[in-house]
């Protein structure tokens, strides 16, 4: 029996700015699993659309975005300096570019385009074909890997999430207001939950983690107990 036979797929879904990627990345590092940031993939498509005229003044031209899909190649490369993978579009590093408020304001609209979701879900399923994967997003446990052995659904108070996002962006030198970020968080929640294709929802068998008042270490302690219970022979 190979080592991968003992490993599982872990799906981490939830609201924006809950720290899903940070937590999923920490889980993967702790377990020696592969981490796949699906949110970064949707942000990468959004960035490409912005740079190629498919989004103008915040208005998304869905047909124009669809026409761009065949021109987008998304890859991840491990960055030893960060201890994590960076995302590339057509060979260009875009890790920093996809985290701007401009991308955040449009990513929910782009994510709702059926052709975009179809392309990226297929890519994600291929990436996660082997066991030993931690994947975070909005529809991992419901659409991408509905048979994942362990599913988490992360949530936190919108004001807490907005403050976290504000601190992250201002630390990078971006000029934003807390009010702007909180509005963006609430608008993304509404868009993610109401879209026709793969809306954000908690899988019936997902375990909820509200991390409004938890540190990353506290979340990890909680997770490792859950993981031990779920993987007991």
Q: How does the language model describe each region?
A:
Residues 12:
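Hydrophobic anchor at the beta1->P-loop junction of P-loop NTPases
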Residues 94-172:
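ATP-dependent NMP and nucleoside kinases share a basic, alpha-helical "lid"
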Residues 23:
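Hydrophobic positions on the alpha1 helix immediately C-terminal to the Walker A/P-loop
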Residues 17:
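Walker A (P-loop) phosphate-binding loop of P-loop NTPases
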Residues 39, 91, 120, 134, ...:
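Residue-level signal for inorganic ion chemistry
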Residues 20:
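Conserved lysine of the Walker
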Residues 30-98:
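N-terminal phosphate/diphosphate-binding loop that engages ATP/GTP or pyrophosphate donors
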Residues 68, 78-79, 124-130, 138-143, ...:
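Small-molecule kinase domains that catalyze NTP-dependent phosphoryl transfer to phosphate-bearing small molecules
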């Amino acid at each position: 029996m190979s080592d991968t036979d003992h490993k599982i797929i872990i799906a981490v879904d939830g609201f924006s700015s809950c720290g899903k990627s940070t937590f999923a990345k920490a889980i993967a590092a702790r377990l020696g699993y592969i981490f796949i940031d699906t949110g970064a993939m949707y942000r990468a498509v959004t960035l490409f659309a912005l740079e190629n005229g498919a989004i103008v003044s915040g208005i998304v031209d869905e047909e124009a975005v669809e026409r761009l899909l065949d021109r987008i190649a998304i890859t991840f490369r491990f960055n030893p300096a960060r201890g994590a993978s960076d995302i590339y579009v057509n060979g260009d590093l875009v890790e920093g570019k996809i985290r701007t408020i401009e991308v955040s304001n449009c990513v929910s609209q782009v994510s709702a385009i059926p052709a975009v979701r179809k392309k990226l879900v297929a890519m994600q399923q291929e990436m996660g074909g082997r066991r030993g994967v931690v994947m975070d997003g909005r529809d991992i446990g419901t659409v991408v890997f509905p048979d994942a052995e362990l599913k988490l659904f992360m949530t936190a108070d919108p004001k807490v999430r907005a403050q976290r996002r504000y601190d992250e962006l201002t630390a990078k030198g971006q000029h934003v207001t807390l009010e702007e970020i909180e509005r963006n968080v609430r608008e993304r929640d509404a868009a993610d939950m109401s879209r026709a294709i793969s809306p954000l929802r908690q899988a019936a068998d997902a375990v909820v983690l509200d991390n409004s008042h938890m540190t990353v270490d506290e979340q990890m302690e909680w997770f490792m107990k859950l993981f031990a219970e779920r993987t007991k022979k």
